[in-house]
UniProtKB/Swiss-Prot annotation:
Residues 302-314 have a biased composition (Polar residues). The expression of this protein is suppressed by cAMP. Transmembrane segments: none annotated. Residues 236-250 have a biased composition (Low complexity). Residues 264-281 have a biased composition (Pro residues). It comes from the Eukaryota. The lineage of its organism: Eukaryota, Amoebozoa, Evosea, Eumycetozoa, Dictyostelia. Residues 231-322, 865-906 are annotated as: Disordered. It holds the Pfam family Dicty_REP. Keywords: Plasmid. Residues 867-906 have a biased composition (Acidic residues). This is Uncharacterized plasmid pDG1 103 kDa protein.
Length: 906
């Protein structure tokens, strides 16, 4: 999902298919058919099927046969066909299609081939959503066990699976060599179901406003989420950057001023390289019992204005100034995982839940620190946010430590279980800080407290987290050196040797095993092994003997790795979850327990001159508005929209704010995960629920099936998509945290709970923030507590993400004009592309003709040059004959000299 594109972009590929292939109607009126995926076809799907059919016929050298006919594909299982559809009568029971049977042990009984393929396809993609678009297709046996463990009892499971995978492999192999697919590498390895799904498109009945909004979001999937809601006045609008800690590449979204109608995203400029200044002699830095955290840079460090400690008080050490010769750190916001150690994310969330419910006591946050085995709190200056952001962590090489680095790193050692507290300077009377708990020498879930609406710079937070990981790594390296009694020079020597001795490590391990055998069975091996030589090789007197110890130390360390490609020992990019706690300072009448606990530490933050008025802060804190904005939840949202600034980031602008100026829409994002095609559907009124299905109204008026169809779907908002087998999923209720719109937009978007009904054989996993919070099996209706701004679930190759979007009423009045303008812009772009294509073809044609003329000219010149060389050869032979005659004439009285001269002149 890294390169999302509008669903319409797929039809550029469709147009190419239309030029080469014409549809052939295969199903005749009144004929019986057992084709796979019946009653799901559109004209585009039939075109795609004809393409595959023609390719398969080419592959089989003209052998006739409908390769998409059920009886042809599944010769061994055609007797299992349960339903015999008839095109004229449609004499089947809709209840029978959607009926789900279970055996005595609770397993789902599947004897319909379409449903069996549906289950196999869904479970295959559950592990890897792009499994069928890769160059090599895994075999069915790799997922057969998964099907059994998922609770399905499929008759002739192996026979169906093997035949289905054989068909997929035949289609992939044939298409990969076909001219239409070779030209488009993205579709070369065909995902049959995903391509049929893309052809079938996504259809939903919407009102005009809903249609226009859906079009905008679908055509521009990279648009900033909720780009069309009211912004503040341009003079007060701030540019914010929001990223998550879950992707290896920094993704940002920027809120730009609304005054300028031309979108001009401005990325943050990278700091220019600076020349390191001479480093003065290091002085002793005041610290706690085990040393305090100090800002360090591995390459160049300058320590300025570090006072000599006058007492043993645990005061905050003044920060050192980092002077880096590299560019800005290449930030990678790390992937959110469950917290390791003794503090879990669930524990933190439960405490935040207590704060939301006003269940706060003086020892509430104390319990969080007690979970960390330590009440020790280390405070660090807020300058660390800016200083750590200037460090290029990718350039750090632990194998080239300098003396001053070693001196400073000895002061990085602190207790294995401690709490780091770093304030943020957000203004007078506004409190914000980053809490980093360290458990057993490793970081666990971090907490960031910030005012509601304040800029949260996750890039700096990530840099700070990596800096603390660097500090932990440096401390552990010092501990390793002290344990082995190594000097810095010895450590450098061992580290540099380790980078080039992978074979050496293997030999050492083999020697250790041999030594163990000698000790255990001395009589058997001493005759064949030189024990003295072996012990000398394993002797710890030289640096070579410690290489295997260093290798084991690095292999088991959470933050250090060996990079053979760059011959260096580097800092890992280790996942560390960050939870964001926001509060509204304007609406509160209560005090919160954790401020009492942090009071003494917060009082240290006025060293830079910015004083925090603690009493005002305590009275202004809003426990009932505290929201847990977990980074893993934000990550799922950002994946859907990629959160990249686009040309529509300021497509709709407006002024003013307030709950009376906004409309709330439900946004359903449908993503074809195989090809990263996206369609967004927005609904305003969902009081009757939302139905997602491939069922179509093909029944006779007043028939039983027609009445049952209306009962199933009712008056719900229908989204029709392509599935390989009958499927109906209904979101019956969506309960928002705010029944009426408030001034808090985040609170307005929050979904409290949903009621979902699953009429399919597929188990629906409800995902919030990357975690499965609940599962709904087939033929079940269940209420799921969401408590987030978005949730998602997947069926086959489609991922459905449901969230809320706020749109201003003023902007809705102009939406039709905006859509029309955007369509006109797209037309102009397409015309430019066509003109460019014509110019390119004309250039290639003229260039080819010119090349032909050049080749002809070269041949002519070569032929002329060859003729000229032949004439020169003839003249040379004549000269040799003349010289022979001259020699003969010289023997006679020198007569004929004149003749010889004349010959030479000729």
């Amino acid at each position: 999902m890294q390169n999302l594109a509008p669903w319409e972009s797929f039809f550029m590929f469709v147009n190419i298919l239309l030029r080469d292939y014409e549809p052939v109607k295969r199903r005749q009126q009144g004929s019986e058919s057992n084709e796979v995926m019946k009653y799901s076809f559109t004209v585009d799907t039939l075109i795609c099927r004809e393409l595959f059919r023609s390719i398969l016929k080419e592959k089989t050298l003209g052998i006739l046969g409908d390769y998409l006919n059920r009886e042809c594909i599944f010769e061994r299982t055609k007797k299992l066909v349960k339903l015999n559809y008839n095109d004229d009568e449609y004499d089947y029971d809709l209840d029978d299609i959607l009926k789900i049977r279970k055996n005595s042990s609770g397993k789902l009984i599947v004897d319909d081939i379409d449903q069996a393929i549906f289950i196999i396809d869904h479970l295959s993609r559950k592990v890897d959503c792009k499994v069928f678009t890769k160059k090599s297709l895994v075999g069915f046996r790799h997922i057969e066990k998964t099907i059994t463990e998922a609770g399905y009892k499929i008759r002739e499971r192996r026979s169906i699976g093997l035949d289905w995978y054989t068909l997929l492999n035949d289609i992939r192999t044939s298409c990969a060599k076909h001219r239409t697919f070779v030209a488009f590498s993205k579709y070369r390895y065909v995902d049959f179901i995903a391509m049929l799904t893309a052809f079938h498109q996504v259809k939903a009945a919407k009102s005009n406003e809903e249609e226009h909004l859906s079009t905008i979001y679908s055509l521009y999937p990279f648009v900033e989420h909720n780009f069309d809601e009211d912004k503040e006045d341009a003079a007060t609008t701030k540019q914010t950057t929001t990223t998550t800690t879950t992707t290896p590449q920094t993704r940002t979204r920027k809120r730009q001023a609304t005054g300028d109608n031309t979108p001009t995203p401005t990325p943050a400029p990278a700091p220019k390289p600076t020349t390191p200044k001479p480093t003065p002699a290091p002085r002793k830095i005041s610290s706690r019992k085990n040393g305090g955290l100090t800002n360090v840079r591995v390459d160049h460090i300058s320590v300025n204005n570090i006072p000599t400690p006058s007492d043993t008080n645990e005061s905050l050490s003044p920060p050192s100034t980092i002077i880096s010769s590299s560019n800005s750190i290449k930030q990678c916001l790390v992937e959110v995982l469950e917290s390791k150690g003794e503090i879990s994310i669930d524990k933190i969330k439960s405490i935040f839940n207590c704060l939301q419910n006003k269940q706060y006591t003086g020892d509430l946050i104390d319990s969080m620190f007690q979970q960390n085995k330590s009440e020790k709190v280390i405070t660090i200056s807020s300058k660390l946010f800016n200083m750590s952001n200037k460090v290029d962590y990718d350039e750090i090489n632990f194998a080239k430590l300098k003396d001053d680095i070693l001196y400073l790193s000895r002061r990085l050692i602190y207790e294995k279980n401690t709490n780091l507290l770093i304030p943020t300077e957000e203004g007078e009377g506004i409190i914000g800080f980053l809490w980093l708990p360290v458990v057993n020498g490793a970081l666990t879930a971090s907490v960031y407290v910030s005012q509601l609406g304040a800029d949260v710079d996750f890039k700096k937070i990530s840099a700070t987290v990596r800096f603390v990981q660097l500090c932990i790594s440096m401390s552990d390296i010092i501990g390793f050196m002290e344990l082995r009694s190594l000097s810095l020079d010895a450590f450098r020597s061992i580290a540099n040797e380790l980078l080039y001795m992978s074979d050496r490590i293997l030999n050492l391990e083999a020697d250790l095993r041999t030594l163990k055998d000698i000790v255990m069975k001395p009589t058997n091996l001493k005759k064949h092994v030189n024990v003295d030589n072996l012990f000398s090789r394993l002797s710890p007197e030289g640096s070579n003997g410690f290489a295997n110890y260093l290798y084991d130390f690095i292999s088991n360390h959470p933050y250090i790795k060996i990079d053979k490609s760059q011959n260096s020992i580097k800092l890992k990019e280790t996942p560390n979850p960050v939870l964001v706690l926001t509060y509204d300072p304007k609406v509160v009448e209560h005090k919160v327990g954790f401020l009492f606990h942090c009071r003494s530490e917060i009082s240290r933050f006025n060293a830079g001159g910015n004083k925090f008025i603690l009493n005002n802060i305590q009275h202004s804190f809003t426990p009932n508005n505290i929201g847990v904005l977990s980074q893993d939840r934000e990550n799922d949202l950002k994946r859907n929209y990629s959160m990249l600034t686009s040309n529509t980031s300021k497509l709709i602008t407006g002024t003013g704010s307030g709950e009376h100026n906004l409309e709330r829409f439900i946004s359903i994002t449908i993503n074809n995960t195989a090809y990263d095609l996206i369609r967004v559907v927005l609904f305003r009124d969902i009081s009757n629920g939302i139905s997602i299905s491939n069922l179509r109204d093909i029944f006779r008026e007043n028939s039983d099936n027609r009445n049952r169809y209306l009962e199933y779907l009712g008056k719900s908002r229908l989204i029709r998509v392509f599935f390989i087998a009958p499927c109906l999923i209904q979101i019956l209720e969506v309960n928002f945290a705010a029944t009426q719109l408030t001034a808090d937009k985040n609170f307005n978007r929050a979904i409290k709970s949903i009621k979902i009904r699953n009429l399919s054989y597929i188990t629906i996993d409800i995902i919030v923030g990357g975690n499965v919070i609940d599962s709904i099996r087939g033929d079940a209706t269940q209420v799921v507590q969401i408590n987030a701004s978005e949730f998602s679930f997947s069926v086959s190759c489609l991922k459905f993400s449901v969230s809320a979007t706020l749109v201003s009423k003023k902007n809705l009045q102009n939406i039709s004009t905006i859509v029309l303008n955007k369509y006109n812009e797209e037309k102009s772009y397409l015309q430019c592309v066509k003109k460019f294509s014509k110019l390119s073809k004309s250039f290639i044609r003229k260039f080819t003709g010119m090349n032909i003329n050049i080749n002809a000219l070269e041949e002519l010149l070569l032929s002329e040059a060859g003729a000229y060389e032949d004439d020169d050869d003839d003249e040379g032979e004549g000269n040799e004959d003349d010289e022979d005659n001259d020699e003969n004439e010289d023997e006679d009285e020198g007569e004929g000299e004149g003749d010889s001269s004349e010959d030479e002149d000729e």
